[in-house]
Amino acid sequence: MAAKDVKFGDSARKKMLVGVNVLADAVKATLGPKGRNVVLAKSFGAPTITKDGVSVAKEIELKDAFENMGAQLVKEVASKANDAAGDGTTTATVLAQAIVNEGLKAVAAGMNPMDLKRGIDKATAAVVAELKNLSKPCADSKAIAQVGTISANSDNSIGEIIAEAMEKVGKEGVITVEEGSGLENELSVVEGMQFDRGYLSPYFVNKPDTMVAELESPLLLLVDKKISNIRELLPVLEAVAKAGRPLLIVAEDVEGEALATLVVNNMRGIVKVAAVKAPGFGDRRKAMLQDIAVLTGGQVISEEIGLTLETTTLEHLGNAKRVILSKENTTIIDGAGVDADIEARVKQIRAQIEETSSDYDREKLQERLAKLAGGVAVIKVGAGTEVEMKEKKARVEDALHATRAAVEEGVVPGGGVALVRALAAIVDLKGDNEDQNVGIALLRRAVEAPLRQITANAGDEPSVVADKVKQGSGNYGYNAATGEYGDMIEMGILDPAKVTRSALQAAASIGGLMITTEAMVADLPEDKPAGGMPDMGGMGGMGGMM
């Protein structure tokens, strides 16, 4: 085992503080509407230019092991805030830096670190509760667009496209972000339920110009097994032919004689039919078939519940207004399912999302939820160069997380004002002893840090602005983009309450741990012997110089 270097007390904390400040100073330059860019060198390719706090934090590693520990702990603050709300990383870093700097001063002055931490925790809980009281629901598109704009570093086009996407697919809908091919951002929306399985045979295509199969007002047969024998299907096909409506078969697979017969019947016009494989695998396939059944008001034909193809009647089939099958995808538009059943299914999937611990499962469940509840929107990000594209895509993803957080827990006035207003909750707060009171006072100063940093980045005097904002009330604050004071919500400067809350909780948590640090252990750097000079080689051929 390698030898270790151990530092104690103030010497350890001083080293840690250097690391905290190096990382936080790089990250906080990006905060606010007039935040600066940070250029990140890559080991290959062009450097990346970003205004995203977490991207800057991820790149920083320091040579000194003890300083690096401080930097990595602040990086953890940014990651925690990002995981909880998808945004607020820079705010969390600024808060953590303020808490650690103030806290270590108090420890150096002889305060009890554990009591300081208890005071900070008490004050944090009170501020979080007050933020909840200050938050207002984020209901309309205008508010959603404003939140998106602020999170995307004051880019209006991003805020507007996210609001439009949410309007089209609903609050529960899936919105994905992809790299586009043009200069402008584009939005495309998939109506109805789409899954990634295409027609089983190109002979089902009835629109040769677009190579899709379109069925108007079809019946849907949903089967959770392979169909290879046409005799099983005959009773259903005859009933559908009599009804004079098209049929879509969704099964584990349709093969051999069964597929050939369906193709022949379709081409001769006896019965208009198309077949597609069921989406997903294993248990997920069964669940997705059940989703389609609920959406279309049909039943899954499964031997597990005593239903077979031979006994299937028209009552077991689902209905939809239209189905479109391409080579890769199938879209079911306007299923005839009962609203109450769909709502119950949505509730069930939501409960599963709450229970699951796997990120992959959660993502798949959310996709299923969106297909039932709303739809799927794709934002294609446009940019002039690849460097700009990466930077812009990261900002769109941030803004999307922020708007989701706003819909979830409401919005508070932005620009660091909400934290200053939440101070009202801790004006009269008292701890159990004097050291806890110092912890509470310490947090009181720290929560002003984001407002001060936004002001400093805009080139104004932080103390003057902070005092003026504190004298105001309600949503009164400072708009760093224009240099004006006024109602932040009316000026469209909003933050999701969840983002502000998560940033403060992450900063107080890690900040409290760093204040109570007494020893640090790191690997000793290995002493490598200095290499000798390389052999100079012969110097022949210089004989006739005399």
Curated annotation (Swiss-Prot):
**What terms describe the molecular function in GO for this protein?**
ATP binding; ATP-dependent protein folding chaperone; isomerase activity; unfolded protein binding
Catalytic activity, reaction form:
ATP + H2O + a folded polypeptide = ADP + phosphate + an unfolded polypeptide
Compartment(s) where it occurs, according to its Swiss-Prot or TrEMBL record: Cytoplasm
The EC number on file is: 5.6.1.7
Keywords (A to Z) from UniProt: ATP-binding, Chaperone, Cytoplasm, Isomerase, Nucleotide-binding
Note whether NAD occurs among the keywords: no
Bridged cysteine pairs (disulfide): none
Q: Does the keyword ATP-binding apply?
A: yes
Quaternary organization: Forms a cylinder of 14 subunits composed of two heptameric rings stacked back-to-back. Interacts with the co-chaperonin GroES.
**Family label:** Belongs to the chaperonin (HSP60) family.
Q: What is this protein called?
A: Chaperonin GroEL
Taxonomy-wise, where does this protein's organism fall, top ranks first?
A: Bacteria, Pseudomonadati, Pseudomonadota, Gammaproteobacteria, Pseudomonadales
